[in-house]
């Protein structure tokens, strides 16, 4: 019984966030996908004999950095230095997050100079995430973390009732 309530709440929360047209939420979910792709495809591409190995290692490092940028509660759980905490907190605005994702995307795409690998998929998702954060900044949407991931989520304001 409780499982179905939890699953139903997660579905409605997740679907509600997707229907919100908030690009910051879209970007956060694409950011989570980027983390998985960076780490998994970075490890997979470590076994090349070209300089793609260097870009694979950089992609893994990008994935680890993105974990702390996208999931800030982990910096409270994991012991990190105050400087690293301040570094990850610097990316609180949509524009800075978009810039970071675009830089990571360019670095990942540079691996194509040596060999076309599956890191292209990582670069595409990183670029899409950067676009979503940039669109959120252009539209004036404040950074909003998904309630499914432990954030505040989308707040829907109810209009004040009018008295007759």
Swiss-Prot record:
<dbReference type="InterPro" id="IPR019365">
    <property type="entry name" value="TVP18/Ca-channel_flower"/>
</dbReference>
<keyword id="KW-0325">Glycoprotein</keyword>
<dbReference type="GO" id="GO:0005794">
    <property type="term" value="C:Golgi apparatus"/>
</dbReference>
<keyword id="KW-1133">Transmembrane helix</keyword>
<keyword id="KW-0333">Golgi apparatus</keyword>
<keyword id="KW-0472">Membrane</keyword>
<feature type="transmembrane region" description="Helical">
    <location>
        <begin position="123"/>
        <end position="143"/>
    </location>
</feature>
<feature type="transmembrane region" description="Helical">
    <location>
        <begin position="35"/>
        <end position="55"/>
    </location>
</feature>
<feature type="transmembrane region" description="Helical">
    <location>
        <begin position="100"/>
        <end position="120"/>
    </location>
</feature>
<comment type="function">
    <text>Golgi membrane protein involved in vesicular trafficking.</text>
</comment>
<keyword id="KW-0812">Transmembrane</keyword>
<comment type="similarity">
    <text>Belongs to the TVP18 family.</text>
</comment>
<dbReference type="Pfam" id="PF10233">
    <property type="entry name" value="Cg6151-P"/>
</dbReference>
<protein>
    <recommendedName>
        <fullName>Golgi apparatus membrane protein tvp18</fullName>
    </recommendedName>
</protein>
<dbReference type="GO" id="GO:0016192">
    <property type="term" value="P:vesicle-mediated transport"/>
</dbReference>
<feature type="transmembrane region" description="Helical">
    <location>
        <begin position="57"/>
        <end position="77"/>
    </location>
</feature>
<feature type="glycosylation site" description="N-linked (GlcNAc...) asparagine">
    <location>
        <position position="22"/>
    </location>
</feature>
<dbReference type="GO" id="GO:0000139">
    <property type="term" value="C:Golgi membrane"/>
</dbReference>
<dbReference type="GO" id="GO:0006897">
    <property type="term" value="P:endocytosis"/>
</dbReference>
């Amino acid at each position: 019984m409780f499982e179905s309530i939890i699953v139903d709440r997660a579905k409605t929360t997740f679907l509600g966030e997707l229907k919100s047209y908030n690009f910051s939420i879209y970007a956060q979910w694409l950011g989570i996908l980027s983390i998985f792709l960076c780490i998994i495809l970075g490890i997979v591409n470590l076994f090349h004999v070209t300089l793609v190995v260097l870009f694979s290692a950089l992609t893994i490092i990008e994935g680890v950095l993105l974990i702390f940028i996208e999931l800030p509660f982990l910096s409270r759980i994991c012991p990190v230095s105050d400087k690293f905490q301040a570094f990850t907190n610097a990316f609180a605005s949509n524009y800075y997050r978009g810039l970071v994702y675009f830089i990571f995307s360019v670095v990942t795409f540079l691996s194509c100079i040596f060999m076309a690998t599956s890191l292209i998929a990582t670069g595409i998702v990183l670029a899409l995430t950067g676009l979503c954060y940039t669109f959120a900044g252009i539209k004036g949407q404040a950074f909003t973390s998904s309630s499914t991931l432990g954030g505040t989520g989308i707040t829907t304001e109810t209009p004040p009732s009018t008295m007759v």
